[in-house]
UniProtKB/Swiss-Prot annotation:
Keywords per UniProt: Developmental protein, DNA-binding, Gap protein, Metal-binding, Nucleus, Repeat, Zinc, Zinc-finger
Protein's recorded name: Protein hunchback
Recorded family membership: Belongs to the hunchback C2H2-type zinc-finger protein family.
Chief location: nucleus
Lineage start: Eukaryota, Metazoa, Ecdysozoa, Arthropoda, Hexapoda
GO biological process: one example: segmentation
Biased composition (Basic residues): 18-31
Chain spans, region Disordered: 18-57, 153-193
Top-level taxon in the UniProt lineage: Eukaryota
């Protein structure tokens, strides 16, 4: 279920444009390297390239899902605030994975350096808060803004959720409630501030 939500997230976000656009570049280069044998291929490749990205989207999603599941285990310990912020970056794993696959090498590098902490929990966010991902995205942006104000509140809240996300694999509802609570508190803080 979260895969479709995740796909929807990617499609909602401008990242999908990057994904298609840059993959078009990538396949163009790929065809360029083949241009020795297929001279016409580079010229045609931008046209068929929209099809490969759709496949690539699926592959990427599967790849991302694996990443999520692996990193979920590692990143459950991450602070929920990071997870919330990462939910805003939900599409960015696609950038990250694209980079690890050798595409977009220039683009995600600054992103990775800017948000290395967020990039990693972000798969956690997509799995744990996928249902809340769409609302959380805005809330996460709010959380980012309110993060400084929430700093005082954040540590105690951080202490409990790392345990509850660990449960997220068994019962996704709990972390969602956690994150919804976090989201609401973030929103309230924003409005109160």
């Amino acid at each position: 279920w979260y895969s479709s939500m995740f796909a929807a997230n990617i499609k909602q976000e401008p990242i999908s444009h990057h994904l298609h656009h840059h993959h078009a570049h990538h396949s163009h280069h790929r065809h360029d390297s083949n241009s020795n044998s297929n001279a016409s291929s580079p010229h045609q490749s931008p046209l068929p390239s929209p099809n490969p990205p759709s496949n690539t989207n699926l592959q990427l999603e599967q790849y991302l899902k694996q990443q999520q599941q692996q990193q979920q285990l590692q990143q459950q310990q991450q602070q929920p605030m990071d997870t919330l912020c990462a939910a805003a970056m939900t599409p960015s794993p696609s950038n990250n994975d694209q980079n690890s696959l050798g595409w977009l090498s220039g683009l995600p590098n600054p992103m990775q350096t800017i948000m290395p902490a967020n990039m990693r929990p972000s798969p956690t966010a997509t799995t744990a808060t996928a249902a809340a991902a769409a609302p959380t995205t805005t809330v996460a942006a709010i959380a980012l803004q309110a993060n400084d104000k929430l700093q005082a509140l954040t540590p105690p809240m951080d202490v409990t959720p790392p345990k509850s996300p660990a449960k997220s694999q068994q019962s996704c509802a709990e972390p969602e409630k956690e994150h919804d609570l976090m989201s609401n508190s973030s929103e309230d803080m924003k409005y109160m501030a």
